[in-house]
A protein has these predicted regions:
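Glycine-centered, phosphate/nucleic-acid-interacting loop/turn motifs that mediate DNA/RNA or nucleotide
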Residues: 41
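Key DNA-contact positions within bacterial/archaeal DNA-binding proteins
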Residues: 32
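Strongly charged
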Residues: 1-20, 24, 36, 44-99
Length: 99
């Protein structure tokens, strides 16, 4: 019998708010900071800049995160039901490029 990890969505969740996902994936330290970064226009979803924290993302979406001098391009791989530890959070995304 397969053991199902209750921390991951296992595709039951087909979309999630961008601010929640950024926080749960540990790309940003707090949800409030994630919301601030989004409002400042530092996030693109599939090459479209967004300033709305309520935008829903799906598996396969490409997120561009601009922080100071760094630009990270990542692919959404999964969702989590809660904030994960650092090792587990790496399963939520795949880094495509860091500039």
């Amino acid at each position: 019998m397969n053991k199902i990890d209750k921390n991951f969505s296992n595709q039951i969740i087909d979309e999630q708010r961008i601010d929640v996902w950024l926080f749960r994936s540990r790309l940003i330290k707090s949800r409030a900071k994630a919301q601030r970064v989004i409002h400042e226009g530092c996030i693109k979803i599939n090459k479209i800049r967004t300033s709305k924290t309520s935008v829903k993302i799906r598996v396969g979406d490409i997120i561009t995160l601009s922080k100071l001098d760094n630009v990270s391009i990542i692919s959404v791989e999964d969702f989590a039901k809660r904030r994960l530890n650092a090792k587990e959070a790496l399963k939520l995304y795949k880094e495509i490029k860091i500039i």
